[in-house]
Amino acid sequence: MFLEEYDVIVVGAGHAGCEAAAASANLGCSTLLVTMSLQNIAQMSCNPAMGGIAKGQIVREIDALGGYSGIVSDNTAIQFKMLNKSKGPAMWSPRVQSDRMRFAEEWRLMLEGTPNLDFYQEMVSGMVIENNKVLGIKTSLGLTIRGKSVVLTNGTFLNGLIHIGDKQFGGGRAGESAAYGITEDLVKAGFESGRMKTGTPPRVDGRSLDYSKMNVEAGDINPSKFSYSDVTKPLVHQRDCHMTYTSLLVHDILREGFERSPMFNGRIKSLGPRYCPSIEDKINRFADKDRHQLFVEPEGWNTCEVYVNGFSTSLPEDIQFKALRSVVGFEKVKFFRAGYAIEYDYFPPTQLKHTLETKLISGLYFAGQINGTTGYEEAASQGLMAGINAALKVKEKEPLILKRDEAYIGVLIDDLITKGTEEPYRMFTSRAEFRTLLRQDNADFRLTPMSNTLGLASDARLRRMEHKLNESEKMVAFFKETSITPTEANPVLIAKKTAEVNQTDKIFKILSRPQIDLSDVLKFENVANYVANNNVDQEILEQAEIQVKYSGYIDKERANAEKLTRLEDLKIPEKFDYHQIKSMSIEAKQKLSKIRPVTISQASRISGVSPSDISVLLVFLGR
């Protein structure tokens, strides 16, 4: 029925579980993916979209590391947008609207085509743990399946409790059972657990909406894609989304249900995602606002089901329906299903190492919402890293730990491990101090070489990345070496209302001006000839432009990152006794003793540990 013992067992087949299973199997480990329903692999439980601000960077990093999310997202996209294009490239974030059903189907097809990967459908009810080491899992039918390592990616299923108005019932997602037993086993083993909350909006019948009353939200005219590989192509055709607004009337109707709202009557005590509040939370917290945006998002190419982005709610169904019917364009709306809130168990992530292995139990890894994060992309990236590190541990190889200056994934995991979280954590560009280095356009430069060394990213991917890097560097060198005369440069400079040049100048210097962009220098004959003669594509041109315009910022961040690296190299002994340092604050001693940072750099990022505490620690360690 099963192998006698698997190298890696992955529990849960959401975004984290799928990436974990794929990574482990692709690294040559015998892998078992266990889920409560094989029909629900890689479900988009909430919005039908991938990417977005900072999240798009994460999807590109997953792809650069050899994960599947970028390819699946490209192959099932119905619309593409590059967000924040009006800002600098450090802020550009790709996002796709997805075909929900095709997304899950594509994930399953890719997993079924992955060697070394087995599947099993059943609820996992507990862990097999001996002498602080995981040995496998127990199922609800009483089976024991042995594994050298286990990755838990349970999403919202651990003791999940769904709320709609004054109704509540167990469930991990609408129409699916919650998972029981795992939390209890882990708490018994010494883990600390907590509760979090998230929510989702109603789904409605698009045939009942009047789109003529809404604003059209179209995709990019020249769409890009997530994957750096050549196995996917940018969209040729796209579906529009739409935008409408709530109103004071809608807000008044929603307030009618507050006394029956689990958020306001005390039934829900857990904290929800700060940056994705429910509609009732928005009108309560921002009572001065007359309206809130609602994005009307199709769920696929061939379905009339629509996701009402911005209307997450746990209010009673009748209030949800009445309020939506008062929204412009929704006057005749028909419901497919009501919105709801869900509470679930999580485990404070300060109990993990940077590999996502638990400190308490050897061979046990956590990834996704079990660690207190929210979002498909955050979950998928953790799953990928947990799957990689579980496989590397089995093979007795060094783990893969991404630093804060190497990837948003590194920032995410470091934040979780060193700071913890008491509310659902989502990634933002503002969380990354080296975001100019961590752009969406260069994730392949940053991560594909190390992934290729591991055996995840193929040689073909590496060659493609090296070609892009070499050609963009040649283009930058051309800009630095090639001069332009005032006769040719000034007409362009005048048109852009920037100072003329009085003598021959380098194209690099001209392009460095904020008023000048790539389309301007392409008007210069020598640039146009270089591009034509060398078949320079748009991706390489954009990469070269970024390197020119932001070279100063990039150099400054690299210098700061090198300083951080020096602190990362200063190790703290594993069992160091912080209580012996009398001049360190009590709070710092407590936090450091609990989190057990591996390096001085990690210690400095822990909340409650001051610079003076770090100075004392450095002196004590003789550094």
UniProtKB/Swiss-Prot annotation:
<comment type="subunit">
    <text>Homodimer. Heterotetramer of two MnmE and two MnmG subunits.</text>
</comment>
<feature type="binding site">
    <location>
        <begin position="272"/>
        <end position="286"/>
    </location>
    <ligand>
        <name>NAD(+)</name>
    </ligand>
</feature>
<dbReference type="GO" id="GO:0002098">
    <property type="term" value="P:tRNA wobble uridine modification"/>
</dbReference>
<comment type="similarity">
    <text>Belongs to the MnmG family.</text>
</comment>
<dbReference type="InterPro" id="IPR049312">
    <property type="entry name" value="GIDA_C_N"/>
</dbReference>
<dbReference type="Pfam" id="PF21680">
    <property type="entry name" value="GIDA_C_1st"/>
</dbReference>
<dbReference type="InterPro" id="IPR040131">
    <property type="entry name" value="MnmG_N"/>
</dbReference>
<dbReference type="InterPro" id="IPR044920">
    <property type="entry name" value="MnmG_C_subdom_sf"/>
</dbReference>
<dbReference type="InterPro" id="IPR036188">
    <property type="entry name" value="FAD/NAD-bd_sf"/>
</dbReference>
<keyword id="KW-0963">Cytoplasm</keyword>
<comment type="function">
    <text>NAD-binding protein involved in the addition of a carboxymethylaminomethyl (cmnm) group at the wobble position (U34) of certain tRNAs, forming tRNA-cmnm(5)s(2)U34.</text>
</comment>
<dbReference type="GO" id="GO:0030488">
    <property type="term" value="P:tRNA methylation"/>
</dbReference>
<feature type="binding site">
    <location>
        <begin position="12"/>
        <end position="17"/>
    </location>
    <ligand>
        <name>FAD</name>
    </ligand>
</feature>
<dbReference type="Pfam" id="PF13932">
    <property type="entry name" value="SAM_GIDA_C"/>
</dbReference>
<protein>
    <recommendedName>
        <fullName>tRNA uridine 5-carboxymethylaminomethyl modification enzyme MnmG</fullName>
    </recommendedName>
</protein>
<keyword id="KW-0274">FAD</keyword>
<dbReference type="InterPro" id="IPR020595">
    <property type="entry name" value="MnmG-rel_CS"/>
</dbReference>
<dbReference type="InterPro" id="IPR047001">
    <property type="entry name" value="MnmG_C_subdom"/>
</dbReference>
<keyword id="KW-0285">Flavoprotein</keyword>
<keyword id="KW-0819">tRNA processing</keyword>
<dbReference type="GO" id="GO:0050660">
    <property type="term" value="F:flavin adenine dinucleotide binding"/>
</dbReference>
<dbReference type="InterPro" id="IPR026904">
    <property type="entry name" value="MnmG_C"/>
</dbReference>
<dbReference type="GO" id="GO:0005829">
    <property type="term" value="C:cytosol"/>
</dbReference>
<dbReference type="InterPro" id="IPR002218">
    <property type="entry name" value="MnmG-rel"/>
</dbReference>
<dbReference type="Pfam" id="PF01134">
    <property type="entry name" value="GIDA"/>
</dbReference>
<keyword id="KW-0520">NAD</keyword>
<dbReference type="InterPro" id="IPR004416">
    <property type="entry name" value="MnmG"/>
</dbReference>
